[in-house]
UniProtKB/Swiss-Prot annotation:
<dbReference type="InterPro" id="IPR006653">
    <property type="entry name" value="Trp_synth_b_CS"/>
</dbReference>
<dbReference type="Pfam" id="PF00291">
    <property type="entry name" value="PALP"/>
</dbReference>
<keyword id="KW-0663">Pyridoxal phosphate</keyword>
<dbReference type="InterPro" id="IPR023026">
    <property type="entry name" value="Trp_synth_beta/beta-like"/>
</dbReference>
<dbReference type="InterPro" id="IPR006654">
    <property type="entry name" value="Trp_synth_beta"/>
</dbReference>
<comment type="subunit">
    <text>Tetramer of two alpha and two beta chains.</text>
</comment>
<comment type="pathway">
    <text>Amino-acid biosynthesis; L-tryptophan biosynthesis; L-tryptophan from chorismate: step 5/5.</text>
</comment>
<feature type="modified residue" description="N6-(pyridoxal phosphate)lysine">
    <location>
        <position position="88"/>
    </location>
</feature>
<dbReference type="InterPro" id="IPR036052">
    <property type="entry name" value="TrpB-like_PALP_sf"/>
</dbReference>
<keyword id="KW-0057">Aromatic amino acid biosynthesis</keyword>
<dbReference type="GO" id="GO:0004834">
    <property type="term" value="F:tryptophan synthase activity"/>
</dbReference>
<protein>
    <recommendedName>
        <fullName>Tryptophan synthase beta chain</fullName>
        <ecNumber>4.2.1.20</ecNumber>
    </recommendedName>
</protein>
<comment type="function">
    <text>The beta subunit is responsible for the synthesis of L-tryptophan from indole and L-serine.</text>
</comment>
<keyword id="KW-0456">Lyase</keyword>
<comment type="similarity">
    <text>Belongs to the TrpB family.</text>
</comment>
<keyword id="KW-0028">Amino-acid biosynthesis</keyword>
<dbReference type="InterPro" id="IPR001926">
    <property type="entry name" value="TrpB-like_PALP"/>
</dbReference>
């Protein structure tokens, strides 16, 4: 059996906790990834797709009206402008090319908000791969536009009714399917979590977010930002933003987890600050679990952050104090969803609205000139029906009071 080429751990987090049957498939994936990273032809094709199909580089936009403090400039890294509507497209193109390189004909994926599913469906349509997407039945309901998009592009969408019928259950089903079909199928994992080598692959295929940001902010401001801020579910958009800044000690890295109905309630999805280390989804990582070690249901108004664990590199960055992790509630995210639309003409994804909410809160307290960059990880078209229903219900409640 070949040895691993890359370190499967970030400090104490990560690893490859999978059934023995999947170990060869993961080792094959790692080996193909390492080779591809050193192959100029692979890199050229990936770069070409990012530029001419996905639309990179994305803009770095200085907000005109969002900052509550004249001392603070808030920039948005516009992953919402990427083809497919979110940062997900970046690494999906990378993994789909990798799958073709390994001779795989089928792609299996899981999705929460549907953005990863859409990105996977478009990459499969483009590259001629068969596509199967597992999605929690609850998410199928709350993300109908994305379900239709996936089907339109030829993907088979499989609703998962087990457990809480959300993202973690979709992950389990996708992993189960892959265990039975890894000889012909590639599991295209959607976040920087799961068993090694996925957290490393996803980070490397998302790191252009931070690389572009660094170049763009130096051009615009002549210096690095004081902080980069991103929402964290599994953590792929955040690690994509953080990766190129980890070795820049002057830049604070801030991840924003979903506080849901409040951190003091069971209705949240913030395992980094409020979970215990456990084994889940093939990795060792902070996990929302009860006293008996059973996985607790996570909760967030945003389907893409509704995940009971988090990527191992985020857990490590938190443990060593290199990044700090805050949280924003449903109400704060909903308020910011509307505020950005009204004051900048940009409708953010509910996920990204969590990061924006914390950035604005942080800006209020600044006492010196400060530059903040928020990763606007996706656009909010997928969320307009959810938000419209919530606002209508709130209006009705206040009318009944």
């Amino acid at each position: 059996m070949t040895e691993l080429k890359l370190d499967p751990y970030f400090g104490e987090y990560g690893g490859m906790y999978v059934p023995q049957i999947l170990v060869p498939a993961l080792k094959q994936l790692e080996s193909a990834f390492v080779d591809a990273q050193q192959d100029p032809a692979f890199q050229a094709e990936f770069t070409d797709l990012l530029k001419n199909y996905a639309g990179r580089p994305t803009a770095l936009t200085l907000t005109r009206n969002l900052s509550p403090n004249p001392l603070v400039k808030i920039y948005l890294k516009r992953e919402d402008l990427l083809h497919g509507g979110a940062h997900k497209t970046n690494q999906v193109l990378g993994q789909a090319l990798l799958a073709k390189r390994m001779g795989k004909k089928e792609i299996i994926a899981e999705t929460g908000a549907g953005q990863h599913g859409v990105a996977t469906a478009l990459a499969c349509a483009l590259l001629g791969l068969k596509c199967k997407v597992y999605m929690g039945a609850k998410d199928v309901e709350r993300q109908s536009p994305n379900v239709f998009r996936m089907k339109l592009m030829g993907a088979e969408v499989i609703p998962v009714t087990s457990g809480s019928a959300t993202l973690k259950d979709a992950c389990n089903e996708a992993m189960r399917d892959w265990s039975a079909s890894y000889d012909k199928a590639h599991y295209l994992l959607g976040t920087a979590a799961g068993p090694h080598p996925f957290p490393t692959i996803v980070r490397e295929f998302q790191r252009m977010i931070g690389e572009e940001t660094k170049q763009q902010i130096l051009e615009k401001e002549g210096r690095l930002p004081d902080a980069v801020i991103a929402c964290v579910g599994g953590g792929s958009n955040a690690i994509g933003m953080f990766a190129d800044f980890i070795d820049e000690p002057s830049v604070e890295l801030i991840g924003v987890e979903p506080a849901g109905k409040g951190i003091d309630t069971p209705m949240h999805g913030a395992p980094l600050k409020h979970g215990k280390t456990g084994i889940f989804f093939g990795m060792k990582a902070p996990l929302m679990q009860d006293r008996d070690g059973q996985i607790e249901e996570s909760y967030s108004v945003s389907a893409g952050l509704d995940f009971p664990s988090v990527g191992p590199q985020h857990a490590h960055l938190n443990a060593i104090g290199r990044a700090r992790y805050e949280s924003a509630t449903d109400d704060e995210a909903l308020a910011m969803f509307q505020q950005l639309a009204r004051c900048e003409g940009i409708i953010p994804a509910l996920e990204s609205a969590h990061a924006l909410a914390y950035a604005v809160k942080l800006a209020k307290t600044a006492t010196k000139e400060t530059i903040l960059v928020v990763n606007l990880s996706g656009r909010g078209d997928k969320d307009i029906f959810t938000v419209s229903d919530i606002l209508a219900a709130k209006e009705q409640e206040s009318g009944n009071d």
